[in-house]
């Protein structure tokens, strides 16, 4: 099974009720589009991807409650509890300048303007005003890099290389 053109948009964390709805914890900025009626998704299983189509969805307590077409009761969907949900690559929305998908940033190398290696992005935190990239540094505590123009100077998605201006106190 290759995941090359598939992008994770959430995880089925539980079932909801007896009619076959699932609770999905979304990890996408486009959750309303990803889980709208008619959306084509893929459930990852040990045997490969299982295609599903959204019949209905709604936001409930920061989780998406989703019912897939053809599912009429909990027994048909319970086996997918804890499985990840993906969208096929061609279904991704086009982003504007200075906007990136998580998988384009995660595992990117971070260097200073002078080329000094700082670490590798391991996580992205959504804080409200701007995202914060968690950078794993060898032998040091993680660095928190705000995704703002004053700090992030360039993002080379193809080479997974991010150049930042190390402002005073940023890496302390």
Swiss-Prot record:
Pfam families the UniProt entry points to: PRC, RimM
InterPro entries linked to this entry: PRC-brl_dom (IPR027275), PRC_barrel-like_sf (IPR011033), RimM (IPR011961), RimM_N (IPR002676), RimM_N_sf (IPR036976), Transl_B-barrel_sf (IPR009000)
Subcellular location: Cytoplasm
One BP term from GO: rRNA processing
Principal location: cytoplasm
Domain PRC barrel: 97-170
Entry comment, domain topic: The PRC barrel domain binds ribosomal protein uS19.
Quaternary structure (record): Binds ribosomal protein uS19.
UniProt xrefs under NCBIfam families: 16S_RimM
Name of the protein in its database record: Ribosome maturation factor RimM
Gene: rimM
């Amino acid at each position: 099974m290759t995941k090359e053109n598939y992008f994770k948009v959430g995880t089925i964390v539980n079932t909801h009720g007896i009619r076959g709805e699932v609770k999905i914890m979304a990890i996408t900025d486009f959750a309303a589009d990803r889980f709208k009626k008619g959306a084509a998704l893929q459930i990852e299983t040990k045997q490969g991807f299982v295609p599903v189509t959204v019949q209905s969805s709604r936001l409930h307590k920061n989780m998406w409650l989703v019912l897939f077409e053809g599912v009429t009761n909990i027994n048909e969907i319970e086996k997918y509890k804890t499985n990840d949900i993906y969208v096929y690559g061609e279904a991704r929305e086009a982003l504007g300048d200075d906007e990136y998908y998580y998988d384009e940033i995660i595992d990117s190398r971070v260097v200073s303007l002078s080329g000094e290696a700082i670490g590798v992005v391991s996580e992205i935190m959504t804080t409200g005003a701007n995202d914060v990239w968690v950078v794993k540094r060898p032998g040091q505590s993680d660095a928190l890099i705000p995704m703002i123009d004053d700090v992030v100077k360039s993002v080379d998605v193809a080479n997974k290389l991010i150049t930042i201006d190390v402002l005073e106190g940023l890496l302390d």
